[in-house]
């Protein structure tokens, strides 16, 4: 069974502040082809865990724009990967209520479509957790320290990050 390593929330939030209004050149900007929000969320999450899962289709990884997992850039796939039951390498999270949230956790919003379509990262909670006090950073549209209450959404869900499953070190010969 893989070990769980802690999530470095401060590293994830620092990354969010650093790149909220610009783009890290190591990653493609998906703004013009569906939006960059979950790509940015994944970058922040990776900054806090340092672990990717290179399983084709069902993993969570980015090598280049043509070689990435659907969970790296897709809102629903991101949710499905984080809340998976399998103990495979990579970040893990749970569906949470507002009282469980901490900086470094994620919000997913269903704006006007039938599906969730936006994934900001929580960068600060200014007092008791309310929509006014939860401050986020995001791409598509770029923002930092934006109150969650400023979004017009149909539905909201929260993802609390627990840590990450560490890849198992297996001997080559058994």
Model-derived segments and spans:
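Short, solvent-exposed loop/turn and secondary-structure capping segments
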Residues: 54-57, 119, 148
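...with weaker cross-activation on analogous glycine-rich loops/strands in unrelated enzymes
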Residues: 62-136
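Residue-level marker of positions within ordered structural domains that often coincide
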Residues: 21, 45-46, 112, 125, ...
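Mature, Sec-exported extracytoplasmic domains of Gram-positive
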Residues: 50, 77, 90-100, 141, ...
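N-terminal capping segments
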Residues: 1-73
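Glycine-rich, aromatic-bearing surface loops/beta-hairpins
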Residues: 121-174
């Amino acid at each position: 069974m893989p070990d769980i390593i802690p999530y470095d929330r401060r590293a994830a939030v620092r990354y969010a502040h650093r790149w909220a209004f610009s783009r890290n050149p190591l990653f493609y900007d998906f703004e013009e082809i569906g939006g960059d929000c979950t790509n940015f969320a994944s970058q922040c999450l990776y900054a806090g865990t340092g672990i990717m899962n290179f399983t084709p289709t069902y993993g969570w990884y980015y090598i280049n724009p043509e070689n990435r997992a659907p969970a790296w850039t897709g809102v629903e796939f991101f949710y499905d990967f984080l809340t998976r039951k399998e103990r495979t390498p990579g970040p893990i999270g749970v569906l949470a209520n507002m009282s469980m949230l901490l900086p470094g956790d994620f919000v997913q919003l269903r704006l006007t479509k039938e599906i969730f379509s936006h994934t900001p990262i929580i960068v600060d909670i200014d007092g008791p957790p309310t929509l006014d006090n939860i401050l986020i950073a995001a791409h598509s549209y770029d923002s930092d320290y934006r109150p969650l209450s400023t979004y017009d959404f149909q539905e909201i869900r929260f993802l609390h990050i627990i840590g990450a499953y560490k890849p198992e070190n297996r001997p080559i010969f058994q």
